[in-house]
């Protein structure tokens, strides 16, 4: 009886520690990143205003079944692979169309957006419908809002 109680206590302590650690992580696997389109709202610490044409706003969408992400940089469509495990998020090589972007500011935004995606090492959900991408040092490189 005493051995059974000790064994139960020994096994329950690590489980409790893992549960408590997950509470502060900002990760809710019940609310996956797959599904909604994610519109870019901050690039680094710079706000990104939505454009007149929602289809041309910088955005991402993740497809769990294929392990692929797709979206728009603002001028060009893009796609690539991704893997995620807990809070880790790794985006593969990004392929993008090569359409000319008439607005130099939009072109610069797209280039910086693609660079931020390539620097991504993890993500954090920041409440309902808001996701931050972080680089390897934990610095926020981009923030998105869900568009359903």
PLM segments and residue spans:
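Lipid interaction determinants
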Residues: 2, 6-11, 18-148
């Amino acid at each position: 009886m005493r051995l059974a109680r000790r064994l139960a206590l020994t096994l329950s302590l690590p489980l409790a520690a893992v549960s408590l650690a997950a509470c502060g992580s900002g990760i809710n696997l019940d609310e996956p990143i797959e599904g909604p389109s994610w519109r870019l709202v901050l690039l680094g610490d710079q706000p990104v205003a939505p454009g007149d044409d929602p289809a041309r706003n910088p955005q991402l969408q993740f497809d769990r079944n294929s392990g692929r992400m797709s979206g728009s940089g603002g001028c060009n469509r893009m796609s690539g692979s991704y893997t995620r495990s807990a809070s880790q998020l790794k985006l593969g090589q990004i392929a993008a169309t090569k359409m000319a972007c008439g607005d130099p500011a939009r072109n610069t935004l797209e280039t910086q957006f693609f660079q931020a995606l390539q620097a991504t090492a993890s993500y954090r959900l920041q409440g309902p419908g808001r996701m931050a991408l972080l680089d390897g040092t934990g610095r926020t490189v981009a923030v998105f809002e869900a568009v359903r």
